[in-house]
Amino acid sequence: MASPTSTNPAHAHFESFLQAQLCQDVLSSFQELCGALGLEPGGGLPQYHKIKDQLNYWSAKSLWTKLDKRAGQPVYQQGRACTSTKCLVVGAGPCGLRVAVELALLGARVVLVEKRTKFSRHNVLHLWPFTIHDLRALGAKKFYGRFCTGTLDHISIRQLQLLLLKVALLLGVEIHWGVTFTGLQPPPRKGSGWRAQLQPNPPAQLANYEFDVLISAAGGKFVPEGFKVREMRGKLAIGITANFVNGRTVEETQVPEISGVARIYNQSFFQSLLKATGIDLENIVYYKDDTHYFVMTAKKQCLLRLGVLRQDWPDTNRLLGSANVVPEALQRFTRAAADFATHGKLGKLEFAQDAHGQPDVSAFDFTSMMRAESSARVQEKHGARLLLGLVGDCLVEPFWPLGTGVARGFLAAFDAAWMVKRWAEGAESLEVLAERESLYQLLSQTSPENMHRNVAQYGLDPATRYPNLNLRAVTPNQVRDLYDVLAKEPVQRNNDKTDTGMPATGSAGTQEELLRWCQEQTAGYPGVHVSDLSSSWADGLALCALVYRLQPGLLEPSELQGLGALEATAWALKVAENELGITPVVSAQAVVAGSDPLGLIAYLSHFHSAFKSMAHSPGPVSQASPGTSSAVLFLSKLQRTLQRSRAKENAEDAGGKKLRLEMEAETPSTEVPPDPEPGVPLTPPSQHQEAGAGDLCALCGEHLYVLERLCVNGHFFHRSCFRCHTCEATLWPGGYEQHPGDGHFYCLQHLPQTDHKAEGSDRGPESPELPTPSENSMPPGLSTPTASQEGAGPVPDPSQPTRRQIRLSSPERQRLSSLNLTPDPEMEPPPKPPRSCSALARHALESSFVGWGLPVQSPQALVAMEKEEKESPFSSEEEEEDVPLDSDVEQALQTFAKTSGTMNNYPTWRRTLLRRAKEEEMKRFCKAQTIQRRLNEIEAALRELEAEGVKLELALRRQSSSPEQQKKLWVGQLLQLVDKKNSLVAEEAELMITVQELNLEEKQWQLDQELRGYMNREENLKTAADRQAEDQVLRKLVDLVNQRDALIRFQEERRLSELALGTGAQG
């Protein structure tokens, strides 16, 4: 409040303005402040200078200092950069207010219209470092004292709007409430300007306001006429937000926030949630702000089962409509999930009230996200030009789990204001549009990691924010259709509704091109003459020659002479799948019989897509080209390795064989997927035989078209049928397992425990390697293929396994959290195994401190960290408050500090380490959600491709009387679809490899914590069971380190192969 000795009423009004927490209170207190100073609100930047000059008040000086520093940046030219520009901003959301502030600082006249009359959204927004610095520079701590005082950086939408509203009012933005923008009113004649169509009954001054810049920030449901919008669809995704009353009690402040938990890497949490409450979620986030804010993604079947949804409807609007949602059940659902996630420490959860006085909980659909194809346009009529720009949700709808909405929204606001500045400087219209579109291309790729590190230098100029900026990435000629002279018909642009992934670059194109490539690859092999894409492959020799050509050493052509056609073809299909990553879409029977020519063409086109860059000269090559199949191949081998690890863990838990301290080095070569266990056939034998093993789905028994075929363990499925037997969730590559007892497929969360006593020795710990072709199962005269050139060697003898100990260096550990893993090229020889369990434990723990996303800190590193804290722009008077820690985190930090001897010497490192741990946790969560979203988009794109493929295949099979040219055209189109599908499947495999990396990282963190608990106990107090459990945890930890090392080596091998390929192409 104002000073007790102050007699100036303006001081009291200013204090009321600072402390106001309701929109109407902000407006009324500012009106009273201006009245006390003899000013009229909305006078532009000159108004700010008048308020500052007349309000000589100690409490305002720190705010004036901050705003003067911002306004004094050279880019604003002392508020004269856009003095002749008149702007209309639609929408008082965070992005609309932020762009209004920037335009006001440039000196433009800014009028903002908002249809609402109050701010009531409690939902919380995640803040990037630059947004924190940006808001602090605008006086955020002055307006909102609790701004970013916790371990997670966030702010509620309502508080952010209030903060920016106060800044906009001080800078002279003219704001009109309860006014709805309905469209543009073009100038009726020369000499007049553009106006807005507004409702209801706007004041005459506003109705007659003519402007030359319109910035739309009115949300995703309103995009001005002329802008094209693209829809990016995934599978059904239902989000739930809930706000509970924050009583700010001591108990509530001690409950740690949850930056994000995702099923994709922490399935145990959601399995426990399901068992305890019956609630099935994909992810959950908890932020503590004005309210206790929870947001989660729920599964539809769970909502139906628990009565939250009355009825299942295919239309999402009807499914989540108010008539189909039971409010009381939704409240029980969210309360139970929130209570479980916080271990019941929040006490009795009471819902906050929304704008309508109802409990603030809602379910929403984010299956599809809208994105404008362009960010700006120019319209001209009667010589009057209007620049239109988009910011906020009407530009790009954010994907809420990533927390990118406000950060990228602010970046778009800065870019839009920069565009207006260039417009005001007199730059050519097409040049302004081209620069804006060049910046827009960067927006969706922007993250804190790929922007400039020094956030203090960020400003309106894009060069201060984006490294390696190219403002000419889009040329003026490419944006001519964005300049619309209304006397002409506007140019219509293609509006694709679905992102189907990468284009079909390098596809086979036509049958003739595919046949020519196959002839080049198989030329010179004895007994092989390829003249067509059907009968030439019936004896299996051509297919074996193709496999040998692409990966020498897998099949020796001389050993194939005299084999049966079916045996040779089946063997080639298996080897191609296990060693080249070429998943079959046609059965061996169909190839030999020639009954599925389209399937064979699709299969051969996969070879072409994966190895199209190989030399055309006949004869073997030393190394296979890194094609799209490499990720599929590695994921397949990684999945088999993880399945063996889970089998060994289950055997250990059941009291199996004695375990080894060292991880067996995995050298997979010619592993063949195990045959399904007898007992429960996936399809009736008669149907299976009749279909030739490829025409019918092994689950539903319906017909399979070429584009629909998904091959798993030798069986073909519809992708839509291949779901978890328990929860019916989509099974992603690397994320499922077939139960040997019932033959069904399960996601890892619902995989039943195996009864090892009943399994026999085939799958027990005595058989760590999957079966390889034996003399009885191999064709006569055909030996086991030799090691592939990708590093696989002969299958080791289980009785004499190859063993090695792996130590990860600090750079390698840091690169584990990145998608581009590049380990050191020179690796030290493996150290000798430690002699004792304690020594091995210390070695494993010193190798990685992934629980906090940091390597073990040396005293020198902590000194640097301490210095960074003191010099950080977030410190000084606006430093974050320290927060209580939960017991587990406190124990881990204290243990680490005691062993490092740093607890007393460096008082700020504890808070810094905790904050960085939360940041790493948030990064992992965001990475997981990005992957999940892209997987959903790929699934939707594959469904569309399959539908198109079915139509083409039906046309080819039924229209026998169609002209030959038409058939060739259809086949060419089918090949393009197959190539697109292969590209999407390869991208899917890449994403799932990253999922496995996240899984291993999460498991290693958990094992780290568990092992530390055992190590911290006094040795004389440990029981035999404790020592046995410690040994078991240690072995699991070493196993995980080796598996993560395999991921590093795979990424490095791919990087080197691609680099070599690129160098060869340039040469």
Swiss-Prot record:
This protein's cofactor list reads: FAD
Indicate, by first and last residue, each region the UniProt record lists as having compositional bias (Pro residues): 671-684
Q: Basic and acidic residues bias located where? A: 646-663, 755-766
Q: Which residues bind Zn(2+) 1?
A: C697, C700, H718, C721
Residues annotated as domain LIM zinc-binding: 695-757
Bias category Polar residues: which stretches? 773-789
Chain spans, region Monooxygenase domain: 1-489
Annotated residues that bind FAD are located at C95, E114, K115, R116, R121, H122, N123, F181, Y293, D393
Subcellular location(s) per record: Cytoplasm; Cytoplasm, Cytoskeleton; Endosome membrane; Midbody
Q: What is this protein called?
A: [F-actin]-monooxygenase MICAL1
**What species does this protein belong to?**
Homo sapiens (Human)
Show the taxonomic lineage: Eukaryota, Metazoa, Chordata, Craniata, Vertebrata
Q: Which gene name does the record give?
A: MICAL1
